C-alpha cells in the first residue's frame, strides 16, 4: 500500500465544538500528517497524508466528526502531500 494525500472540506456545526482538536488527535493516532484549519465561511479544511488504510479510516471518521460536531457536507480531492511532519491546527 502506498501513501495517499487529500484535502478535505467539511461543513455544518464544525467550528467552536472542538472539531480541529479531535481531528488532530485522531490523525495522530492513525499516524497521519497534515493540518486542520477553520475557514472564514464556517467550514473546516483538513489536509491528511499517510498510509492508504489510515487515510481511508480518517475519511470515514471525518464524515461523522466528533460527537460535539454535526457534519452536513464533506468534499475531498487528491492533493500534494504536506511539507514537514506532524499535524497542525490554526
Curated annotation (Swiss-Prot):
InterPro entries found in the cross-reference section: Acylphosphatase, Acylphosphatase-like_dom, Acylphosphatase-like_dom_sf, Acylphosphatase_CS
Catalyses which reaction(s): an acyl phosphate + H2O = a carboxylate + phosphate + H(+)
Family named by the database record: Belongs to the acylphosphatase family.
Organism of this sequence: Aeromonas hydrophila subsp. hydrophila (strain ATCC 7966 / DSM 30187 / BCRC 13018 / CCUG 14551 / JCM 1027 / KCTC 2358 / NCIMB 9240 / NCTC 8049)
The EC number(s) this enzyme carries: 3.6.1.7
The UniProt record lists the keyword Transmembrane helix: no
Matches recorded under PROSITE patterns: ACYLPHOSPHATASE_1, ACYLPHOSPHATASE_3
Keyword Hydrolase: yes
UniProt enzyme class: hydrolase
List of catalytic residues: 20, 38
Superkingdom of source: Bacteria
PANTHER family recorded: ACYLPHOSPHATASE
Start and end residues of each Acylphosphatase-like domain: 5-90
Name of the coding gene: acyP
Protein name: Acylphosphatase
Database matches in Pfam families: Acylphosphatase
Keywords for this protein: Hydrolase
GO molecular function (one): acylphosphatase activity
